Amino acid sequence: MKIKNRIIALIALLCIVIGSLAFIGCKNGGNTKINEIDYVAQLSLNMDSETKKQKVTVYNYIDGDTTHFKLSEPIENTNILKARYLAINTPESTGKIEEYGKAASDFTHKKLQNAKEIYIESNDSNWNKDSTGVRFLVWVWYNTESDSTFRNLNLEILQNGLAVASSIGGTRYASICQNALDQAKQLKLKIYSGTPDPDYFYGEAIECSLRDLRLNIEYFNGKKVAFEANVWRSISGTLYCEDYDEKTDRWYGMQIYNNNNGISSEAKAFLTMGNRVRIVGTVSYWETGATYQVSGLEYDPRPEPGTEKNYIKLIKTGVEPNFLEIDAAEFTGKQNVELELDEDVKKFDYAELALYTSVKATGLKVKKVYTTTNPDSSSVGAMTLTCEKDGKTIIVRTGVWRDDNMNTVTEDDLNDKTIDIQGVVEYYEGNYQIKAELYSDLLRCE
C-alpha cells in the first residue's frame, strides 16, 4: 500500500512539474495570449512643454528613421530640416539593404503621407543635431483626418517591431519607448519575429545583363543582381555605368549608390571612371528621385572558393564613355522605340531606354536659364537650361560650372547662346533631362 501511495505521489509531482514547464513555455512564445497595449495612444503631445516644436510638411522621404521636412520657420538659417528620429534605429533601405528595411521605410512613408498635420519636437529646450552635424534629432508627431489626436511616430515604429533602440535612456519618453520595445519583442513582431522578411531577397545574386535589368526593372526590385558595365562617371557618391547590347543595338545605363560603407580603399580605387566592373548589389526604388538604383555593394579581395560571384570585381581599365549623339525629336518622343522581347514587342520612350547613359546633344539654343539660389540647396549656382532644337524642347541641368580661370559661369554667359553639351540622361520631376555636371561637358558655346 505504501509503495502504491508513493507511486501516486510521484506521478502527481511529475504532473505538476510538467504542467509548470508547459506554463513557462507558453509564457515564452507558446499559446498564452499577451495583453497587447497601444502605448502610442497613452502618449500625448504637450504643446506647453519646454521643448521646441514646429509644424512641418514632408520635403523628402528617405527611410524608416530619416525624413527631410519643410519648415514653417527657419531653424539655423535653413528651411529644410533633415530629421533623424530620436530613440530608434530602423533597418537600412537605402545603401546597404537590410531585412525589414523596406517595411520600416514604407510604414513611415504611409503614416506621413496620410497625415493631416505633422509636428516635430526637440528632446529638450534646444534643437539638437546628431553626430553627423547635419541631421536634427527629433520626435515626430502626426494626426489624421479621422483622428485629431497626435500620435508619436517614433514610438509607433518601435511598437510595431520595426526598429531597435537607439540611446533610449537619454530621451524624454524613455520609459514608454522601452515598454513598447519590450512588447514588440514579446509579440515577436517584424524584426523580432525570427521569420524571413517577405520583401528581402535571401538568394544569391541573379546573373543578368544591364539590358535585362533595365527592361525588367520592376521584377528585379528588391533582388540582388550581378552584371558587368563600364563606369563612366562618379558624382557625389553616385556612379553611372553603361553597357552596349548587340541584340537591340542600344546602350543601357544604371546608377549605383555607393556611400563606400564597408568598401575597402582597393575597391574604391577601381570603382572609378574608365573601368569595366562586375557590379553586385541590390536593386531598390529611390524615393527621392522616383527611379531605381543598385546599392549595397560588397567587396572581398580574398573571397572563399565558390563565393566570388557575390562580390564586385575589376574586369578591365581604359574604357571610354560612349556619348551617343541624340536627335532632339527622337529624344523627346513618346513610345517611339519598339523592341522584341521574348517573342513580344514592347514600346518604350527613347529617353527611358537611354536613362543613365552618356549622351551628347549639339546645336541647342538656350531659351531660358534658371539658377538655383536657395541657400538650403547643395547645388547653389547650378543652372537649368531650357533649350530648343528643331522645334523640340530639351532640358539641361548643369553643375556649378567654373571656367578655366575659376570664374563661375552664369546665365549671362549662356542666355540666347547655341551650345553643344554632353552628360548623363536623368529623370527629374516626371521629365527626362541631360545632366551636364562638369564645365568640360560644355563642348561649345557661341
Question: Residues of each region from the PLM?
Answer:
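C-terminal motif of bacterial Sec signal peptides marking the signal peptidase cleavage site
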Residues: 22-25
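Second-shell loop/turn segments in exported
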Residues: 92-99, 106, 122-123, 138, ...
